[in-house]
Structure formats: C-alpha cells, structure tokens
Regions:
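Conserved helicase/translocase motor-coupling segment
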Residues: 1-59
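C-terminal accessory regions
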Residues: 61-173
Length: 173
C-alpha cells in the first residue's frame, strides 16, 4: 500500500524526528540479521535531503535501503535506480517513514496518516491541514486530538512573512 505519515512539525513527540525513530523500531528494528550503519537499517525508507547533481538524486527523492556494509549503503529509488552512498554522504539521507507536510508538497499517496496534537499549536492552520489532506488520493487518517483538529480548521490566519522581496525588486527596476 502506498501510504505516508505526515507531521506538521519536526520536533515534539508526534513530530517527524520522534515518529521516524518509533516507526523504524516498530517496522524495521535493528536485529542481528538486519544490517545496520549510522542509525540506518537495511530495508529502511529514506529520503534524500539535499540535491546531488553528480548522483542525479534530489531533495525529496524517496527510496529504500537495499544493501549495507561497514562503509557504504545502497538506496533503490522508485525508478529502480540504485545509488551508492559512502559514509561521508550519509548526512544527505534521513528516515522517511514520516515526513513533514512541507516536504510532501507536490507528492501524492493512496493513504495519508496525519497526527494532530495540541503540542503542534503553532502549526495548526487550515492551509497546512489542506495541504496534508490533499496529498491523499483515497484515504486520510487523522490521529490525535479533536481540539487540535478544530483549531486547525478554524485557524485561517497564516504567518506573515517579511521577505523584503518587493523592496529588492523595486531596487532593480
């Protein structure tokens, strides 16, 4: 099944980082039979987090670790391309059992699971909920707190960003 857990935030108990560790432990635990290196296990779902033009893999590409030894690992991406990473390139990868709503933009999944908890109060906004829900083609599973859901639905205020873009463009014209 094409399923993805999305979280509004990286931190907190229901954030990307903590949930990735929890799901790795539950779905693909470290065992004597399962090769492991630098916190990654053979079979882990991983995401490339920076562009690498020499390897032709880009920020947001998701794959699965298919081989590990003491100095390198191989990730198979969805287009059946195998990419080898040496130990000094491991920082270009992160677990992808869970990803942020922001990282999921532009992607679609059959099923999306979205934890909504009050600890994410700063990110509980209607537009973020809309983005997460519209990543799902068939099914959305909301897990958590009804109050957090109601907060997100009723909060249509987005943070105002001060980029100075207009001023910078005016200077160039």
């Amino acid at each position: 099944m094409d399923m993805q857990v999305l979280s509004p935030m990286r931190r907190e108990a229901c954030g990307v980082d903590a949930l990735n560790r929890t799901l790795q432990e539950a779905l693909n635990p470290e065992t004597e039979d399962n090769a492991s290196i630098a916190g990654f296990h053979s079979g882990d779902k991983v995401m490339q987090i920076r562009n690498d033009y020499t390897k032709n893999v880009f920020n947001g590409d998701v794959g699965r670790i298919v081989w590990i030894d003491t100095e390198k690992l191989i990730v198979q991406y969805t287009d059946d391309v195998d990419i080898t990473y040496t130990r000094d390139e491991f920082a270009s990868l992160t677990l992808a059992y869970v990803m942020s709503v922001h990282k999921s933009q532009g992607s679609e999944y059959s099923t999306v699971i979205l934890p909504l908890v009050r600890a994410h109060h700063i990110m509980l906004q209607r537009n973020l909920l809309y983005t997460a829900v519209t990543r799902a083609k068939k099914r959305v599973i909301l897990v958590g707190d009804r109050i957090a859901l109601f907060t997100a639905v009723s909060n249509d205020r987005t943070r105002r960003r001060y980029t100075l873009l207009a001023e910078r463009l005016a200077e160039r014209i």
